[in-house]
From Swiss-Prot:
Species per Swiss-Prot/TrEMBL record: Mycobacteroides abscessus (strain ATCC 19977 / DSM 44196 / CCUG 20993 / CIP 104536 / JCM 13569 / NCTC 13031 / TMC 1543 / L948) (Mycobacterium abscessus)
Classification via InterPro entries: ATP-cone_dom, NrdR-like_N, RNR_NrdR-like
Cofactor: binding comment: Binds 1 zinc ion.
PROSITE patterns from the UniProt entry: ATP_CONE
Protein name, UniProt field: Transcriptional repressor NrdR
Record-level Gene Ontology MF annotations: ATP binding; DNA binding; zinc ion binding
Required cofactor names: Zn(2+)
UniProt keywords, alphabetically: ATP-binding, DNA-binding, Metal-binding, Nucleotide-binding, Repressor, Transcription, Transcription regulation, Zinc, Zinc-finger
Amino acid sequence: MHCPFCRHPDSRVVDSREADEGQAIRRRRSCPECGRRFTTVETAVLAVVKRSGVTEPFSRDKVVKGVRRACQGRDVDDDALNLLAQQVEDAVRAAGSPEIPSNEVGLAILGPLRDLDEVAYLRFASVYRGFSSAEDFEREIAALRAHRDAPAES
């Protein structure tokens, strides 16, 4: 790591700590040349591979925007949407891959959204899964009811 003060090509790590709820590492560094200290923050970049093959950085804001559309007219606040986006990011990061297909991001949204608001879930699932008939909705509603009636896992 280059020193930002004297541009010396090496530095020594003095202290490392988790930051941003475990999503980043904050390091205090010391330059052996000028003796000054500086801080770096390291994060692992998570990339989303779209259907077209284009790669873009994962964006919680994009998740919130997409889910907000499904929640339009529903009693869902911004805090709940931000928490859902965090859950989605945690789930896709847990896969351990630096690149994740966009359809896996959509799948990661479905579970938390179903628990948050069933109507919003149906709206999102109908677009995401490309529902084309009333039967598609009926099947999904039956699956929702089965999930709701299933005993909670302990």
